[in-house]
Amino acid sequence: IRTSHVMAKMINENFDPAFFKVVEGGISETNALLAERFDKIFFTGSVAVGKIVYQAAAKYLTPVTLELGGKSPAIITDAANLKLHVKRIIWAKFINAGQTCIAPDYILLPKSLEQEFLTLAKAEIAQEHFAVANDNYVQIINTKNVQRLANLLDPAKVYCGGGFNEQTRVFEPTIMQQVSFDDKIM
């Protein structure tokens, strides 16, 4: 599914372009846009590109909101309905192949719930709608990001998943365990 194309079509067909417009593109389109003067810039993406956006906005003192990712935890307590929480966390993490800014990146839970959580999570990922063979399976945005993700994996800590294909830009839903804040993935 070409989500950005669908969004651009819907917005550009229904809003006055003087008010709101979606422009799809790469580096050249982004550079052309950054040369323009705007009332406000809202950017979601990498730190590296965020710095470029901010520097360009400074030329006109344009207000900027940067959403540059980060790490979003999910916290589970002893009182939680674990099966329900696992279902919701897996959905939230793997929608759009985890490429959403609020996707949970790690789980904080009592040690006593760890194994049950892992078992339930692996079973949830095994559902057909998460299958890599599914025609609607979402691709990672580009090969560079597939390589970036692959470099973050510590094979010794992969509980399930971890497979990827650079050519098709598909990365299996992956769960790692015993991860510390010193690991590359964090």
What residue spans do the PLM features occupy?
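Conserved residues at the C-terminal ends of beta-strands
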Residues: 23-26, 44, 92
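Short alpha-helical
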Residues: 1-2, 27-29, 48-49, 59
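A structured beta-alpha segment of the ubiquitous adenosine-cofactor-binding alpha/beta core
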Residues: 4, 21-39
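Conserved small-residue-rich beta-alpha loop and adjacent elements
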Residues: 1-18, 61
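Phosphate/pyrophosphate-binding betaalpha-module
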Residues: 14-21, 36, 44, 48-51
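Short, well-ordered alpha-helices that flank and scaffold nucleotide-derived cofactor binding pockets
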Residues: 9, 13, 35, 55, ...
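ALDH superfamily catalytic-core signature
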Residues: 40, 48-184
